[in-house]
C-alpha cells in the first residue's frame, strides 16, 4: 500500500440527499463542542485539580438544547465497597426529531463507621443510610458520564490534556 492520502468525504457529500439536515447537524455539533461557561466549572474538593460541571448545569443544558429528555436507570448494584448505577439518557435530537440516547455509569463509595476501615464483606460496618446517600450520588455521576458524550459544552474535555478542536465543515 503506498502512502497516498485518501480524501475523506465531507458531511455534505455524506448527506447529499438532505443537505439541510447535514448543515443543522454540523451546527448542533458546533454548539455542543463549545467550551462550557467557565463560571459553571467547579474544582472537586477532594480529587486534586479535577474539574466538573454540577448536575444542575447539565440538566439545564439538556432542557435548553434538547427540550425533551428523560433518565432511565438500567442497573444498580454493588461494586466492591461502592454502589454502582448505569443510566440511559434519552433525548430528542433537535435536527432529526427522533429520540436517541447515551448510556453512562457512575459509582459512589459507601460510608463506613468511623475507625472501622474499609467496608467489610458482611457490610456490618456501613453507616445507617449509607446506601440512601450513595445511590443518588452514583446516579448523578452516571447521568453526567452519559452527557459527556454530547461534547465539550457538557464537560467532556475538562480533565483531558490533549484534545482536538471541532471545526464544522464549510460545505
Locations of regions flagged by a protein language model:
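Positively charged, aromatic-enriched nucleic acid-contacting surfaces
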Residues: 58-170
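N-terminal, Lys/Arg- and Ser/Thr-rich interaction peptides
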Residues: 1-55
Amino acid at each position: 500500500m503506498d502512502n497516498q492520502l485518501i480524501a475523506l468525504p465531507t458531511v455534505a457529500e455524506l448527506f447529499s440527499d438532505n443537505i439541510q439536515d447535514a448543515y443543522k447537524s454540523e451546527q448542533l455539533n458546533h454548539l455542543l463542542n463549545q467550551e462550557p461557561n467557565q463560571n459553571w466549572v467547579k474544582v472537586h474538593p477532594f480529587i486534586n485539580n479535577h474539574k466538573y460541571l454540577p448536575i444542575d448545569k447539565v440538566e439545564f443544558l439538556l432542557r435548553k438544547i434538547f427540550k425533551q429528555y428523560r433518565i432511565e436507570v438500567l442497573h444498580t448494584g454493588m461494586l466492591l465497597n461502592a454502589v454502582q448505577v448505569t443510566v440511559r439518557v434519552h433525548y430528542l435530537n433537535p435536527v432529526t426529531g427522533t429520540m436517541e440516547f447515551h448510556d453512562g455509569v457512575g459509582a459512589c463509595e459507601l460510608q463506613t463507621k468511623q475507625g472501622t476501615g474499609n467496608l467489610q464483606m458482611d457490610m456490618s460496618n456501613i453507616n445507617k443510610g449509607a446506601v440512601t446517600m450513595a445511590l443518588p450520588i452514583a446516579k448523578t455521576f452516571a447521568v453526567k458520564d452519559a452527557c459527556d458524550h454530547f461534547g465539550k459544552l457538557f464537560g467532556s474535555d475538562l480533565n483531558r490534556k490533549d484534545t482536538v478542536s471541532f471545526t464544522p465543515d464549510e460545505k
